[in-house]
Amino acid sequence: MSRVCQVSGKRVQTGNNVSHANNKTRRRFLPNLHERRFWVASENRWVKLRVSAHALRTIDKNGIDSVLAELRARGEKV
């Protein structure tokens, strides 16, 4: 399973660890992903999504129904 948020599209980024001596080694910045269930009252069912913390705030702000509508418009199976 890929480390990509289903709502916001956040994914793994790459960069450097930088030591005190300014030595650089490659590293990955992982998104803060959580597998969460959301109750969709209009469909009378639970929907399981893999979302980032940023996407959780978006769902709180806009509502799960509008977020699911955007996902379906993108062609994602929910």
Curated annotation (Swiss-Prot):
Keywords: Ribonucleoprotein, Ribosomal protein. GO terms for molecular function: structural constituent of ribosome. GO terms for biological process: translation. Residues 11-22 have a biased composition (Polar residues). Coiled coil: none annotated. It comes from the Bacteria. Residues 1-23 are annotated as: Disordered. Belongs to the bacterial ribosomal protein bL28 family. This is Large ribosomal subunit protein bL28. The lineage of its organism: Bacteria, Pseudomonadati, Pseudomonadota, Gammaproteobacteria, Lysobacterales.
